[in-house]
């Protein structure tokens, strides 16, 4: 379970945004909402140990995220977190399957090709497993990013504007796949978004509070 209690995070030396009370059980999703530039991405980076936390607390299970040293943050990020970035960071010349398999390589773990193939199958991309990422549509590439985020069976998945630039059908498909993948994996899911369409799903919503 992810728990956040009045977290104030920033970029550099100064606080940027406050996130109040957040709880997300395994398989549960929370929308972190606010206008563009309101610090949502910074809040995600702080949960990942990549942006400074100025005050407040956050726990993943019984691990106090605010008490970890840099090495501990790196280990936890590699072993227990998955990410779906707005810029998907797929390697254009690699296949969909090989892009999914980058996750364990980055974490220093052995690749799990059978699980990667099963994930691609579960999101409807089994037939495109060997297609280069540069030949995938935006929606297909987004699915590959979701599969990559789930490969290591993370306890926490952080998604930054996962439906940006998608039409209504692709938005619905992407969100449904992301929610289902989190449930199947048992991962708490935090989605930073200013896409009003996501609110229609009745998910838990937390507003960010800009500090400036």
Language model segments and positions:
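Catalytic Walker B motif of ABC-type/P-loop ATPase nucleotide-binding domains
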Residues: 157-160
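Helix-to-loop junction immediately C-terminal to a conserved catalytic motif
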Residues: 48
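Conserved ABC transporter NBD signature motif
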Residues: 56-64
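Conserved ABC ATPase signature
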Residues: 132-136, 140-142
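Conserved catalytic motifs of ABC-family nucleotide-binding domains
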Residues: 153
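ABC ATPase NBD coupling module
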Residues: 65-82
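Conserved ABC ATPase "signature" region
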Residues: 64, 111-128
């Amino acid at each position: 379970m992810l728990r956040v209690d009045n977290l104030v995070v920033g970029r550099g030396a100064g606080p940027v945004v406050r996130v109040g009370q957040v709880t997300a059980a395994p398989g549960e999703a929370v929308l972190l909402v606010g206008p563009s530039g309101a610090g949502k991405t910074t809040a995600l980076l702080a949960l990942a140990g990549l942006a400074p936390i100025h005050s407040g607390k956050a726990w993943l299970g019984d691990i106090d995220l605010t008490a970890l040293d840099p090495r501990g943050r790196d280990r936890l990020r590699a072993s227990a977190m998955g990410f779906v970035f707005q810029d998907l960071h797929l390697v254009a010349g690699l296949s969909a399957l090989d892009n999914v398999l980058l996750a364990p390589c980055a974490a220093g773990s052995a690749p799990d090709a059978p699980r990667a193939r099963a994930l691609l199958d579960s999101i409807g991309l089994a037939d495109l497993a060997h297609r280069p990422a540069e030949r995938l549509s935006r929606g297909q590439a987004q699915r590959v990013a979701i599969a990559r985020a789930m490969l290591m069976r993370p306890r926490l998945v952080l998604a930054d504007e996962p439906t940006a630039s998608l039409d209504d059908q692709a938005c619905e498909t992407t969100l449904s796949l992301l929610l289902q993948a989190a449930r199947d994996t048992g991962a708490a899911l935090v989605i930073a978004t200013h896409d009003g369409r996501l609110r229609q799903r009745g998910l838990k919503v937390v507003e960010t509070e800009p500090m400036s």
